[in-house]
From Swiss-Prot:
Pfam families: Pan_kinase. It comes from Pseudomonas putida (strain GB-1). Belongs to the type III pantothenate kinase family. SUPFAM superfamilies: Actin-like ATPase domain (SSF53067). It comes from the Bacteria. Keywords: ATP-binding, Coenzyme A biosynthesis, Cytoplasm, Kinase, Metal-binding, Nucleotide-binding, Potassium, Transferase. This is Type III pantothenate kinase.
Amino acid sequence: MILELDCGNSFIKWRVIHAADAVIEGGGIVDSDQALLAAVAALASVRLTGCRIVSVRSEEETDALCALIAQAFAVQARVAHPAQSMAGVRNGYDDYQRLGMDRWLAALGAFHLAGGACLVIDLGTAAKADFVAADGEHLGGYICPGMPLMRSQLRTHTRRIRYDDASAERALTSLSPGRSTVEAVERGCVLMLQGFARTQLEQARALWGEAFTVFLTGGDAPLVREAVPQARVVPDLVFVGLAMACPLD
């Protein structure tokens, strides 16, 4: 079985799949390396034969995690690295090594699934969009604060904004004008995300008309689903690209 890891800015998304058919044995999201080791070890009858990682962490942090995995499960992790081109997609950055690996792998996965032009909208700690033309040319993209960053900045820099996660969840039962601070903040942030998504859709239509596929991924993808109803929601899109970048027997 293969352990796949997406090490983001705030959390580690993980899953264990069967090597032969990619059937998912287990998975989840954790907030530390130790929590990851415990979660994987808790899977009954799982014997890992390989591990592949995409990480936006520092090289030192990623190496430390690889060492922990080797010690705990006796497998050597393969880490995805930037490339100028791969699987029919050409990296569109002037300095290809500066394109975030999560964005690069999501673009690979989306182009593979779409078989043509595609727009990837990834909503996590940051909100990201990337455009890939029908010939595989990555045209670039956009990055702005995602829901967690917007919320955090308002809480940090505005003294009277204080509320808990349960209140935040209740506030999103609708998007009508907020009648409390928590409703105003949460709904305002969602509307900003939806506006971001709609703008990307307009850009894609200006480029390709209707001849493209939209992909939504990331933990906050459900918040913009109604803004882009034609989108394909693929929570594990980065893992699709990771399997292409780091094939394992």
